[in-house]
């Protein structure tokens, strides 16, 4: 049975990233139509530049190519590739079939990587351009969430054990800070992308030097003109047959890092959902379990974690691919890159769409948070109580021993009897502590235990987050809708 299948058929496997999760716009960027249309555009740009620099290419040939950029006979191309065992030459023939007058000058002087690699770089750039505003929107939604809850005390956790208090907004800023680093890295790697350009079979530009009869300047002009037509500021000066596969490492490393950030955020949300302090959106008709109707599973956060793990592992592909590119190139890269580049971007696209949807509907339960604080705060307040007693004339050592005994009794009630923490009640009825009984409410005010959390939130948002989001103001209103 021949390899390949009808990918629109229910009898043929289709990647869930495309069929179930990723956005239509990201799927289109990695589609065959987008790819092969870009090949034709690159052939047109090459012909236009070659004509401008004096090669015998007519206006009629150029116009014929322009008129057929979208006229792609995919069936013919597939048949040609089956016959020739070469995808680029299959599309040269297919393009030439609908451009008979231009057929002889299509791909003039070029090698397969002229269309293959340059198209990949265009796709990487455009895919990054799709991700950047999506990530900015996630940051914006979380920034709104953090600002609104900047002063809401909550129990902090280290080692997932109760620690000092923080605020809900401050905790959210930990998430935002990681995503801001990801946004900066995505922008950097996007701006650092260079075009492969017009380089020939081993990167020496020998074929173009021959076409222009040894004119170095025209060869350099050709490279520059096509690079500018493709919208790049610069091209690699040095290439082998391909652009260095280190570029793929750079791009997928940034995406993998984004995956790590999203995994951490969504894990926190899942843990908070278990504590009943916070939940992701839950639709009115949504079913959490087929057997347990009360369940409210954090399905979206779980999906993000599941896909983020996949995204983090994909960076190993370009690392290994770059390491086995012998001399000017081997074909070890080809099949692998067809999979890992598309999957990385479709996965990143999915987790950003999902995280935006989550961040637009996060639900906080202040009463649950308050109750958990009441359970733990008495123990945390013991040092403040000791200091207040010393100020009232008591002995630190005597007070410490009193607190120690009462704390152990209260802990026994919590752990052995399943009761509430009654340390404060014990202190309130103990005559030894009568000098500070009137101060206990103040000493137990949760806001006095959150330090500068709310001020940190305000400063972080104003100095770091809002300036970073400013270039994306025009796209901030787009909502994230999930079908599944």
Swiss-Prot record:
Catalytic residues identified in the record: 159 (proton donor/acceptor), 289 (proton donor/acceptor)
Outcome when changing residue 311 to V: In ADSLD; severe; slightly reduced enzyme activity
Effect ascribed to mutating residue 452 to P: In ADSLD; severe
CDD domains named among the record's database cross-references: Adenylsuccinate_lyase_2
Gene Ontology cellular component annotations, sorted alphabetically: cytosol; protein-containing complex
Cross-link position per record: Glycyl lysine isopeptide (Lys-Gly) (interchain with G-Cter in SUMO1): 415
SUPFAM superfamilies, sorted: L-aspartase-like
Effect annotated for changing residue 426 to H: In ADSLD; severe; most frequent mutation
Modified residues (N6-acetyllysine): 147, 295
Record keyword Hydrolase present: no
Pathway membership, UniProt: Purine metabolism; AMP biosynthesis via de novo pathway; AMP from IMP: step 2/2; Purine metabolism; IMP biosynthesis via de novo pathway; 5-amino-1-(5-phospho-D-ribosyl)imidazole-4-carboxamide from 5-amino-1-(5-phospho-D-ribosyl)imidazole-4-carboxylate: step 2/2
Result of changing residue 194 to C: In ADSLD; severe; reduces protein stability
Outcome (variant: residue 374 to W): In ADSLD; severe
Gene3D superfamilies (UniProt xref): 1.10.275.60, Fumarase/aspartase (C-terminal domain), Fumarase/aspartase (Central domain)
Residues holding substrate: 20-21, 85-87, 111-112, 241, 303, 329, 334, 338
Residue ranges of coiled coil: none
GO function terms (MF aspect): (S)-2-(5-amino-1-(5-phospho-D-ribosyl)imidazole-4-carboxamido) succinate lyase (fumarate-forming) activity; identical protein binding; N6-(1,2-dicarboxyethyl)AMP AMP-lyase (fumarate-forming) activity
Pfam families xrefs: ADSL_C, Lyase_1
Biological process according to GO: 'de novo' AMP biosynthetic process; 'de novo' IMP biosynthetic process; 'de novo' XMP biosynthetic process; aerobic respiration; AMP biosynthetic process; AMP salvage; GMP biosynthetic process; purine nucleotide biosynthetic process
UniProt disease link: Adenylosuccinase deficiency: An autosomal recessive disorder characterized by the accumulation in the body fluids of succinylaminoimidazole-carboxamide riboside (SAICA-riboside) and succinyladenosine (S-Ado). Most children display marked psychomotor delay, often accompanied by epilepsy or autistic features, or both, although some patients may be less profoundly retarded. Occasionally, growth retardation and muscular wasting are also present.
Assembly notes: Homotetramer. Residues from neighboring subunits contribute catalytic and substrate-binding residues to each active site.
PANTHER family linked to this entry: ADENYLOSUCCINATE LYASE
Annotated protein name in UniProt: Adenylosuccinate lyase
Gene: ADSL
């Amino acid at each position: 049975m021949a390899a390949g299948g009808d990918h629109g058929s229910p009898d043929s496997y289709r990647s869930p990233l495309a069929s179930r999760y990723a956005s239509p716009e990201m799927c289109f960027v990695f589609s065959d139509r987008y790819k092969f249309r870009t090949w034709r555009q690159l052939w047109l740009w090459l012909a236009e530049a070659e004509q401008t620099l004096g090669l015998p290419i007519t206006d009629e040939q150029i116009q014929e190519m322009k008129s057929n950029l979208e006229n792609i006979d995919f069936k013919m191309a597939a048949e040609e590739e089956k016959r020739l065992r070469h995808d680029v030459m299959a599309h040269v023939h297919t393009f030439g079939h609908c451009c008979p007058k231009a057929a002889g000058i299509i791909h003039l002087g070029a090698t397969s990587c002229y269309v293959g690699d340059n198209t990949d770089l265009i796709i990487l750039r455009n895919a990054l351009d799709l991700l950047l505003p999506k990530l900015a929107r996630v940051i914006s939604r979380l920034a709104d969430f953090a600002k609104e809850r900047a002063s809401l005390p909550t129990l902090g956790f280290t080692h997932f054990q109760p620690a000092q208090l923080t605020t809900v907004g401050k905790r959210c800023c930990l998430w935002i800070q990681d995503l801001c680093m990801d946004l900066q890295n995505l922008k950097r790697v996007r701006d650092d992308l260079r075009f492969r350009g017009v380089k020939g079979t081993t990167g020496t530009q020998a074929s173009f030097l021959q076409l222009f009869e040894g004119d170095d300047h025209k060869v350099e002009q050709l490279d520059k003109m096509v690079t500018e037509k493709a919208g790049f500021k610069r091209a690699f000066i040095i290439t082998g047959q391909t652009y260095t596969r280190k570029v793929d490492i750079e791009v997928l490393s940034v995406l993998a890092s984004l995956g790590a950030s999203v995994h951490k955020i969504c894990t926190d949300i899942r843990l908070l959902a278990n504590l009943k302090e916070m939940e992701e959106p839950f639709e009115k008709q949504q079913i959490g379990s087929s057997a347990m109707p009360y369940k409210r599973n954090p399905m979206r956060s779980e999906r993000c974690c599941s896909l983020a793990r996949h995204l983090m592992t994909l960076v190993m592909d370009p690392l290994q691919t770059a390491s086995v590119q012998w001399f000017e190139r081997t074909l070890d890269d080809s099949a692998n890159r067809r999979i890992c580049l598309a999957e990385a971007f479709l996965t990143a696209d999915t987790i950003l769409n999902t995280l935006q949807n989550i961040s637009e509907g996060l639900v906080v339960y202040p009463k649950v948070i308050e109750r958990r604080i009441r359970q733990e705060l008495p123990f945390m307040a013991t040092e403040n109580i000791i200091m207040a007693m010393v100020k009232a004339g008591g002995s630190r050592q005597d007070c410490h021993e009193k607190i120690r005994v009462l704390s152990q009794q209260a802990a026994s009630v919590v752990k052995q009897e399943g009761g509430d923490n009654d340390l404060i009640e014990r202190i309130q009825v103990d005559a030894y502590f009568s000098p500070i009984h009137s101060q206990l409410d103040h000493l137990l005010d949760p806001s006095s235990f959150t330090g500068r959390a709310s001020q940190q939130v305000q400063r972080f948002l104003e100095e770091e987050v809002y300036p970073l989001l400013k270039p994306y103001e025009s796209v901030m209103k787009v909502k994230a809708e999930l079908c599944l």
